[in-house]
Amino acid sequence: MKTLYESLLDDDLITKTDKMIKDEIKLFLKETYNGVVKISKKPNADGKYEVSSTGNVSVKNRDIISLTNGTFIWTVVGGDFYCNNCNSLTSLEGAPEKVGKYFYCDNCNSLTSLEGAPEKVGGGFSCYGCGSLESLKGAPKEAGEAFYCSGCKSLKTLKGAPQMINGGFSCHTCNSLTSLEGAPKKVGGTFCCDMCISLISLEGAPKEVGGRFYCNNCAGKFTIEDVKKVSNVKGEIKC
C-alpha cells in the first residue's frame, strides 16, 4: 500500500541534491494543486521542505495511509484542502497548519483520530461519514463558517469540537452519541443533532444558536421546552 508521496522517494534519497528533490516535488504537485506554490529554499530542522499554496490542494480518492513523508510538509493552503474518500488514510498528520477555506476529510473510513488536522480553517471543516472516528480530539480550534461531523457512526463524544462556530454545526446520524457534551458553546447558524439514535440527553448543547435547532428522530423524545431549557435558540426548533 502506497503512502501519499511514495513516488517522490527512493532508497538513496539522502544522496539526492536539493534541486533534484525539488524537481520531483514540483512534478508531483502539478496534479494536486492550483494557484501559486512556494517551496522553502532549504529543509527545516526536521529535514523536510515546507510547501505552501495560494489555491486549492486535492489528494482525494487516493489509496494512501498517511499525508506525511520524509520529503515535504504542507504549511499553509490558501484555498480548499481535499483528502476525502481516502479509505486507507489513518491519520491527518502532515495536513496544513492553516487552510484559508474548507478542509474536507469526509468518508475516510479508516481514520480514527483528527490529530494533525489544521489548527485554523477559515471556511469550514468536514469529516462527514468517517465511520471509525470515535472522538473529535485534534479538530481545528477555529473553523469559521461551519463544522460537520455527521454520519460518524462510531463517534462517542463531541469533545474536541471548536467552541464557537460562526455558521452551522451538524452531528446528525452520529449513532453512538448519547449526549451533546463537548458541543460548541455558540453556533451562529443552524445546529443539527437529529437522527442520533442513541442520543438520550441534550446536556452540553450550545448555549446560543443563531439559526435553527434540530433534534428530531433521536432516542430521547425531546420537546421544544427541553431545548429551551438548555439553549437560547433564535430560529425554529424541530423535535
What annotation goes with each model-predicted range?
Residues R62, C86, C108-N109, C130-G131, ...:
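Conserved "Asn-ladder"/turn position within leucine-rich repeats
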Residues L67-G70, L89-A95, L111-A117, L133-A139, ...:
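Canonical leucine-rich repeat
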Residues E31-K101, C105, G144-E145, I165-G167:
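LRR N-terminal entry segment and analogous cap-like coil->beta motifs
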Residues S201-C239:
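Leucine-rich solenoid repeat scaffolds
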Residues V51-S53, V59, V76-V77, C83, ...:
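Extracellular beta-strand solenoids
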Residues M1-K48, S53-N56, D226:
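Charge-dense, intrinsically disordered terminal/linker segments
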Residues S58, Y82, E93, Y104, ...:
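Extracellular beta-strand solenoid repeats
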